[in-house]
């Protein structure tokens, strides 16, 4: 409804002469004088009015249609945009390598007319026999290598369900050349790698090698790592030179604790059939020595038992001959008594012979059973119980020589040693201890194990309590406060050789 007071107030404030325009503005602003006045002066701002050629400053009043359009524009100014549509995409693409990896140096314009195949043949002809032999001696293991980019290698390993064995080499390091000459050339190691790994060897100066050393930080060459092709995770790594035997043992221990399918084959059970039983493989020289001592003691006891069984029989025969001689010197009246005594002695000797033969047969059967048990048992050498005294009407004491006595003492010392813990049998570090007698102990420890664990292992294996351990070069005495240090703190991981000095 029109309010004449509000209209007249608006006209007096604004100085507008058109009452219809004022009514329209008031209606659009709900008859609010302040808002209507602001709207009027905003519309008639002199800065928005274009200058005219006339000398008089006149402004044509806006029409009702223009005012209504502008007001509608103000009310519909707040518009909302459409929502962003959903889409599926990869956070990191499979081929995430930078473009620099595929960059190749531009060839010279003069090299376009060169025949590289012909030049290669000329250079090979000029090479001496020594150069050819050296190149063949230090050449990489091409028969087990897999060529391609790291992504291609991972795809191939994932299809074969193998782990990736990576070897990063540096031409300036001689240990890398030794690795090709001594380690990768081993036939047994080649078979192990070819059946369980995809082997990838690359130079550190190669673009692929540079990219690998950036993703997996490498500070020393040669560098060996085992990669899971599914996730790209580095499972294990090592640096420096390693011989073929230690490398094979390193890979076998890795395969025994890791499986591509996640299921590790359990060790063979002891309840398997007799045909499938195999002799235990002794890894250390001490275990082989213990087995040899036990077998030698068995053989000597068998010989002594046989010699002991003949001695009482000879005594019985001597007694029989003496009795026969005495009977011959007697009168004819005592002939009946002599014949009776001879028959009784003969029957006793036959009984003794029968019992001795039965005992020998039982002992042979026991020896066969104990040998089978030695092959089955993995941790202990069973005790052989043989009776040194046999009863043949009288007790015969077996005399033991000095050498046999020493062997018995060694056996008793070995039997007293019982390893109640797993120290020296598991871990990621291989520690070798050279004993004064020329023997070498080899044990597996963890990098966080202390030096006193090695002392305990050596004491259990050798039975010696007063000794010291020290490194070769630089010479370091591992005693005192250093016994509480770990292998990692003393830089003895993942492998080290220690010397033993008996006090």
From Swiss-Prot:
Locations of Low complexity compositional bias?
A: 50-71, 314-350
User: In the record, which residues are listed under signal peptide?
Assistant: none
Q: Where is the UIM domain?
A: 284-303
Q: Which InterPro entries match?
A: Thioredoxin-like_sf, UAS, UBA-like_sf, Ubiquitin-like_domsf, UBX_7/2, UBX_dom, UBX_domain-protein, UIM_dom
A GO BP annotation: proteasome-mediated ubiquitin-dependent protein catabolic process
| Residue span of region Disordered | 47-80, 262-284, 299-389
Q: Which GO terms describe its cellular component?
A: nucleus
Record's Pfam families?
A: Thioredoxin_7, UBA_4, UBX
- Point to the regions of Acidic residues compositional bias: 362-387
- Its domain of life reads Eukaryota
Q: Where is the UBX domain?
A: 424-500
GO: which molecular function terms? ubiquitin binding
What this protein is called in its record is UBX domain-containing protein 7 homolog
This protein's encoding gene? ubxd7
């Amino acid at each position: 409804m029109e309010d004449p007071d509000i209209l007249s107030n608006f006209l007096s404030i604004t100085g507008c002469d058109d009452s219809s325009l004022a009514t329209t503005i008031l209606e659009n602003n709900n008859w609010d004088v302040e808002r209507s006045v602001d709207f009027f002066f905003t519309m008639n701002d002199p800065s928005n009015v274009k200058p005219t050629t006339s000398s008089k400053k006149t402004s044509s009043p806006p029409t009702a249609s223009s005012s209504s359009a502008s007001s509608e524009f103000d009310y519909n100014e707040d518009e909302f945009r459409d929502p962003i549509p959903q889409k599926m995409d990869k956070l990191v693409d499979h081929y995430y390598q930078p473009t620099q990896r595929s960059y190749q140096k531009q060839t010279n314009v003069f090299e376009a007319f060169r025949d590289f195949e012909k030049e290669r043949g000329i250079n090979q002809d000029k090479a001496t026999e020594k150069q050819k032999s050296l190149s063949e001696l230090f050449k990489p293991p091409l028969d087990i290598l897999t060529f391609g980019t790291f992504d291609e290698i991972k795809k191939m390993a994932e299809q074969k369900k193998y782990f990736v064995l990576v070897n990063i080499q540096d031409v300036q390091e001689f240990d890398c050349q030794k690795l090709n000459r001594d380690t990768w050339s081993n036939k047994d190691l080649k078979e192990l790698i070819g059946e369980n790994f995809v082997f990838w060897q690359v130079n550190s100066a190669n673009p692929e090698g540079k990219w690998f050393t950036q993703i997996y930080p490498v500070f020393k060459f040669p560098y060996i790592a085992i990669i899971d092709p599914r996730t790209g995770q580095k499972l294990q790594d090592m640096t420096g030179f390693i011989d073929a035997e230690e490398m094979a043992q390193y890979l076998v221990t890795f395969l025994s604790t890791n499986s591509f399918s996640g299921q590790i084959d359990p060790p063979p059970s002891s309840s398997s059939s007799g045909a499938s039983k195999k002799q235990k493989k002794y890894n250390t020289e001490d275990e082989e020595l213990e087995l040899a001592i036990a077998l030698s003691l068995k053989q000597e006891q068998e010989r002594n038992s046989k010699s002991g069984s003949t001695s009482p029989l000879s005594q019985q025969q001597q007694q029989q001959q003496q009795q026969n001689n005495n009977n011959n010197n007697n009168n004819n009246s005592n002939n009946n008594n002599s014949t009776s005594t001879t028959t009784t002695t003969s029957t006793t000797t036959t009984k003794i012979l029968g019992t001795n033969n039965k005992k020998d047969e039982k002992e042979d059967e026991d020896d066969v059973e104990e040998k089978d048990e030695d092959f089955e048992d993995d941790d202990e050498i069973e005790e052989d119980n043989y009776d040194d005294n046999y009863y043949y009407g009288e007790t015969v004491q077996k005399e033991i020589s000095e050498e046999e006595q020493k062997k018995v003492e060694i056996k008793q010392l070995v039997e007293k040693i019982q390893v109640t813990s797993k120290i020296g049998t598991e871990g990621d570090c291989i520690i070798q201890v050279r004993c004064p007698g020329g023997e070498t102990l080899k044990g597996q420890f963890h990098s966080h194990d202390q030096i006193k664990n090695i002392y305990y292992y050596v004491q259990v294996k050798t039975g010696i309590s007063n000794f010291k351990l020290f490194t070769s070069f630089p010479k370091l005495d591992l005693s005192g406060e250093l016994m509480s240090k770990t292998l990692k703190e003393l830089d003895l991981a993942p492998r080290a050789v220690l010397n033993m000095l008996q006090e």
